[in-house]
Amino acid sequence: MPNRSTCSLVALAAFATLTGQAAAQQQLNIYNWSDYIDPTIIEDFTKETGIRVVYDTYDSNEILETRMLAGGSGYDIVVPSAEYLARQIQAGVYQKLDPSKLTNLGNMWPMIQERVAAFDPDNAYSVNYMWGTTGIGYNTAKVAEALPNAPLDSWALVFDPQYAEKLASCGIDMLDSPGEIIPAALNYLGVNPDAASAEDIQKATDLLLKVRPFIRKFHSSEYINALANGDICVAVGFSGDIFQAR
């Protein structure tokens, strides 16, 4: 599975405290990605603390950001991807963390903290929750049937129209996440995936428009079951999701 694995390309999520009222009210309101926590952990937490957890989920950073920037979300903890942190911090939707109350900070992986610090200087508003890669998962049998000698070790599999067109017959799904897809497209074009100029973003846009007719759906969770059930043969997604589909 070709993947993005450098600092700017790692899909990170970070906890961020929003209010200080939850403990007093004996209720903690959490907004997280779907399938990102074992439900038994929530049950165990409530048994140990007596604090009730209200747990809601979303499928894209854009949904989370829209809700956060609108204000008054009511959530105490949310889990944005790292590249969205800076804009949200600047908008004032988070409170600073009190490191003295976070007794497990010493267990954080320094390398990942440094990467997140590019978006959250000094890790003042967030702590690492999860990291992984974004890449391509595929059904080997279906891909071999639709495209013999497919370039399975290359992003050309989904970004080259001559390949994408043939794979459209068995189905391609792609993450509904510009923060993941655009850097991948830039990298495929030989451009710095961190590039942010209008010219470079347009290059990625033009590439994506060429293969857009061959993409069945843009979504950030449905591709898991679709790939597992054989409804599609290729999925651009998060590594954990691809592993789950396998």
Kindly give the residue locations of the regions a language model identified.
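Sec/Tat signal peptide C-region and signal peptidase I cleavage site
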Residues: L18-A24
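Early extracytoplasmic/lumenal segment of secretory-pathway proteins
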Residues: Q25-Q88, N225
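A ligand-binding cleft/hinge motif common to bilobed small-molecule-binding domains
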Residues: Y84-R87, V234-R246
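Paired acidic/hydrophobic, glycine-rich loop segments that form the ligand-binding mouth/hinge
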Residues: D76-P80, R216-K217, C233-F238
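Extracytoplasmic ligand-binding site segments that recognize negatively charged/polar headgroups
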Residues: V79-L85, I89-F214, H219-A228
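Bacterial N-terminal signal peptides that target proteins for export
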Residues: M1-L9
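Bacterial N-terminal signal peptides
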Residues: S8-T17
